[in-house]
Amino acid sequence: MSRIGRLPIKIPDTVKIDVKDNLVIVEGIRGRLVQNIKDSINVKVENGSVIVGRVFNDKKAKAYHGLYRSLIFNMIKGVTEGFSKSLTINGIGYRAEQQGNSLFLSLGYSTQFEYVIPDGVSVKLDGNTKISVEGIDKFKVGQVAAEIRSLKKPEPYKGKGIKYDNEIIRRKVGKSGVKK
């Protein structure tokens, strides 16, 4: 049995969970999330907690057991607390500005990048070098942060680019001139 999958998930008072056919619907203060569940997994709501089990005992069902338990846990956490990722822009002349649901990034190229912010995710700027991505869906928040970071990954010599706040960039030593 999956060590993560067999743990019950406690449901907070502010969260309502509904299981219909192969859908798990989680509603909370911040919003509503829906997750499709495979046929090999069953989800039950009992005594104020969610119990994830499996119908079959094959290898795939064992793998999905822990996965769906974690997905449901993240859904509950998302509708109660939400998720956020912070990014920092390093580099001379590198900056970001927000207009409506678009993020314009100047990253040392001749043109600006325009990143359209998808629904379900909000982006906040602190100054013009700090970006905070927030939302209730952990996957969407991480995906948006990764897409913004991929526009200009930090380079190892000067550290210029977009990096996560908790990310450590391994720096390299540049060329050293030979003395004659």
Swiss-Prot record:
TM stretches of this protein: none
Cellular component terms per the entry's GO annotation: cytosolic large ribosomal subunit
Assigned keywords, A-Z: Ribonucleoprotein, Ribosomal protein, RNA-binding, rRNA-binding
Chain's role: This protein binds to the 23S rRNA, and is important in its secondary structure. It is located near the subunit interface in the base of the L7/L12 stalk, and near the tRNA binding site of the peptidyltransferase center.
Protein name listed in UniProt: Large ribosomal subunit protein uL6
Organism: Borreliella afzelii (strain PKo) (Borrelia afzelii)
Assembly behavior: Part of the 50S ribosomal subunit.
GO biological process, one term: cytoplasmic translation
Tagged with keyword Cell membrane: no
One term of GO molecular function: structural constituent of ribosome
Family stated for the protein in its record: Belongs to the universal ribosomal protein uL6 family.
Classification via PROSITE patterns: RIBOSOMAL_L6_1
